[in-house]
C-alpha cells in the first residue's frame, strides 16, 4: 500500500447500533488480515450512543479509529452539496445517501476515498487492496485483488435443514 507524502490511508465504513457486534467482528478481520496499515473512520447512521462508541474503541485496538458525529457530518455534507437539490434530498432521505456522500467529503484535500462495507469478513491475509496508484484515473468498485472471494449466507454457517 502506498501512502501519499506520508499521509496514512483512511478506510471508511458505515455502521449502526443494530448489528454493531457483527460489524466489529468484520472490521477486526479487516485489520487482522490486512498486511497494509491504515486508519479507520466510521460513519454512523445516527443510532450510535456514547456507550456504543466506547465499545468500538475498546474492541478495535490495532489501528487508529475515528467516528463521525452524525449531525455535524450531515450538515457538512449538505453544505458540500449546495446547489444540488436532488443530491441533498437523497442524502437526507436515504441510508444510501449517507453511504454514498459522506466518504467523499471526509477530507476534501484528499481526492481518494476508500470505503468498505462493514459486513464483509476477511478470512485470509491480503495486501494491496487500498492502493492510490490504482485510482489515478477514476474509481474502483468491488475490487478483489485475488479473484477468489467467497459469498456466504448466514444459513451456510448453520448447515442444511
What do these predicted regions represent?
Residues 35-39, 64-68, 91-93, 129, ...:
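Glycine-rich loops and low-complexity Gly/Arg-rich segments
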Residues 140-160:
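A short, conserved beta-to-alpha structural element at the edge of catalytic cores
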Residues 57-109:
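Active-site-proximal specificity loops/subdomain of glycosyltransferases
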Residues 95, 99-145:
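GT-A fold catalytic core of metal-dependent nucleotide-sugar glycosyltransferases
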Residues 26-27, 55-57, 128-131, 155-156:
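Short, glycine/charged-enriched secondary-structure capping and boundary segments
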Residues 36-38, 42, 56-59, 87-89, ...:
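N-terminal, helix-rich and Lys/Arg-enriched segments in bacterial and organellar proteins
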Residues 1-80:
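N-terminal anchoring/stem segment of glycosyltransferases
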Amino acid at each position: 500500500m502506498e501512502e501519499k507524502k506520508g499521509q496514512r490511508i483512511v478506510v471508511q465504513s458505515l455502521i449502526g447500533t443494530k448489528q454493531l457486534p457483527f460489524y466489529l467482528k468484520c472490521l477486526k478481520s479487516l485489520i487482522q488480515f490486512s498486511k497494509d496499515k491504515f486508519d479507520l473512520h466510521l460513519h454512523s447512521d445516527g443510532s450510535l450512543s456514547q456507550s456504543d462508541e466506547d465499545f468500538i474503541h475498546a474492541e478495535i485496538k490495532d489501528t487508529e479509529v475515528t467516528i463521525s458525529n452524525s449531525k455535524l457530518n450531515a450538515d457538512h455534507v449538505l453544505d458540500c452539496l449546495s446547489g444540488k437539490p436532488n443530491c441533498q434530498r437523497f442524502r437526507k432521505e436515504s441510508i444510501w445517501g449517507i453511504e454514498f456522500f459522506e466518504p467523499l467529503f471526509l477530507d476534501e484535500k484528499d481526492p481518494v476515498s476508500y470505503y468498505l462495507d462493514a459486513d464483509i469478513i476477511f478470512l485470509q491475509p491480503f495486501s494491496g487492496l487500498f492502493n492510490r496508484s490504482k485510482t489515478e484515473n477514476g474509481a474502483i468498485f468491488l475490487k478483489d485483488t485475488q479473484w477468489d472471494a467467497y459469498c456466504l449466507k448466514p444459513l451456510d454457517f448453520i448447515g442444511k435443514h
